[in-house]
């Protein structure tokens, strides 16, 4: 359950990017201590990039589980970029409304899902500074936008912390 730290430079702005293991529901008891170091990294971070596998059928529950965990460790108010990955693997099977069951309560196209998340985020009382991003790391869809948003957020945080260096970036 190790984290990986790399120096990243976007448009001449250097920062450290820490990749942690994903949040795991019902973590085996023996791994709880190892996972605490990952949570320490999250608490120390200036910006969180929450990457969600949009092709996973329970992605909304996974988002909720991460939200609960962040609240438990006191990191719920950290600036966060919500990134839905694997848009290339998201599948939509057209179904008749009569065929939908409580288990398939939402049978949405990717555009419908995107619109739904945009509405949820904008209506939230502590709405994030940037809307959710929809990308595919495999096909590079949305990667330039992700880079740009990360740069903007890191630059904003850097300018707040070091206003005398603002001219550098």
Give the label of every model feature segment.
Residues 57, 61, 65-169:
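C-terminal-of-GTPase-core extension/linker across diverse P-loop GTPases
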Residues 4-6, 13, 47-50, 78-80, ...:
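Structural beta-strand/beta-sheet cores of well-ordered domains, especially the beta-sheet scaffolds
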